């Protein structure tokens, strides 16, 4: 690589937590995913806060919270302000994930980490892309291009390919799936051969995955046995990702008459179920070839479900007849309708709980997967209830005081406006030359003013209280009061309003009624629950298995490999396997949390700071697309608060070509201590650079003129003899190859020696010097 490439791990290494990594390519910094775990750990936020103002672009790979969950917080609370790139389905389904996550938390607790407005503000910054669409970055990212490729894990899931100057190829591929499924094709790998750097995960590196047919049979058997035993089935799924695969599978099974499931109910339960299905209908072109053909040939949208009922709450689900199969979010059972149904149904041995996703360790779902024999567990019961009695009275009193304070503030503002209007009116009275005009519409104050020779010191009012109502005006005329136009029959009485405020309504109420306009509080209790229902884990994660991951990496043959997101033993196993088949041709890194990996392979490239006096003294010569100069300088250390991303690079000053090189002479007899410090910074531990405010960076300063040593001329950009022949012919010099030697005008011979250098032979004549000058012009000489 001829670029400086570093990866800083903010989260998701040597563990199964959320994914978040900072990739530096020369001066440009990418944030690869911006995930948040199920427990909303603030450690991820603290790591992100240190680097948030350095980030130039965010690349999102999947729409679930583990890949973009922290984005609303980063934009709303941390001030993240940069371009965000994602595919169209990741944009749409990502919103559904975050809406459902927020509502699931808000229904049972006082959730304040982010709001729906934060979600909207974050997703408004996303630039939506299509698969294989090449985006050339500008500004600091000049020369960089990004391309999203299908990952096959979720709809819109992306493998990101980052290319620098058409040469360096960096591939970010996490949670990919090479197998074709009902609603998605597998990932495309034909465009990812021999990348310079591959960043991938080891989540499934040691996982032995059952065959898909075996998993489908296990699911069908479980569902049939439970329904025929008059029990209900809870399938814990995500909001808008892998749920589409299960919805397609179950709806197809329900259509099959031989299965005999048509008499049972099938439901999808989450806060945005209708929107998820509608978005899926409009994104068929992002799905598998099979669904595309079905849509094109039969003109039948595959997401027009026949048997799947869409429910947005427990009251909707209560109207679905039992026994039933319910696809409910969230997959971790930490919040949402899946947790509510689990608490209701797990104590009945007739029911069945099916887990389809290995969530982060520490969640309820992961506990049940890792401890299948555990039958008793402590569960925190959270719910939102109406305020009653003294609490309700205190709340209403506080609200009343707030309204009175707001009303007083509004009245004071109106009084200020009225006083300003009165002063304007008095100024109008003082103008005797004012021309009085007639209008069809009544203008403000017209006809109510009486002239007076002396200005009154105080405005007179009638004896009895009769305040004059001043007519408010704006650019469009008199301001309208909406309450003046309400139909009296439709206005609620004060008694009804007070009942609504106090939450006192008659009649039956749904178990999940909207409490947004009613005073509520959240309560929490911990109970020991006995699990009598059958709990089963069936893998519908949509990831490649361990053996396939190793074969895919071997097929790609990356020159460097960084392994992230996976347990330590899985990462170690994948690293050893890659070293075994790659040998010395591959470098494998397994970074720790908050560690910076330097993936720059060229040893002569470092980051230094050039003084303006040094840059102004350089004499550049052009070679193809690059400009080169010789530098004589000395390294010094400096404490700087400037972002190191703007530092010029020693190996690529004004460099766009592949043959560029910058050579540095730094005599050892000048400032030896500074040299040692600079070298320690250059070759030392890069992982200490964690984006702190002040960093010690090496600075290259010019040598005094009397200390500048001489140097031999360096010839760069060596030409090919065939190209030089064309140059000679254009100049009217006869040239032809004789035994591998270029003979010019039968007087001068140009040959390439065994060491690869070009030699010029011939008698000293005018043609010799002319040909030599033409040969020199092909080089960049510094």
Curated annotation (Swiss-Prot):
One of its GO terms (biological process) is mRNA 3'-end processing by stem-loop binding and cleavage. Pfam families: Beta-Casp, CPSF100_C, Lactamase_B_6, RMMBL. Residues 417-430 have a biased composition (Acidic residues). It is found in: Nucleus. Residues 407-452 are annotated as: Disordered. The modification Phosphoserine is found at residues 419-420, 423, 660. One of its GO terms (molecular function) is RNA binding. CDD domains: CPSF2-like_MBL-fold (cd16293). PANTHER family: CLEAVAGE AND POLYADENYLATION SPECIFICITY FACTOR SUBUNIT 2. Component of the cleavage and polyadenylation specificity factor (CPSF) complex, composed of CPSF1, CPSF2, CPSF3, CPSF4 and FIP1L1. Interacts with CPSF3, CSTF2 and SYMPK. Interacts with ZC3H3. Component of the cleavage and polyadenylation specificity factor (CPSF) complex that play a key role in pre-mRNA 3'-end formation, recognizing the AAUAAA signal sequence and interacting with poly(A) polymerase and other factors to bring about cleavage and poly(A) addition. Involved in the histone 3' end pre-mRNA processing. This is Cleavage and polyadenylation specificity factor subunit 2. It comes from Bos taurus.
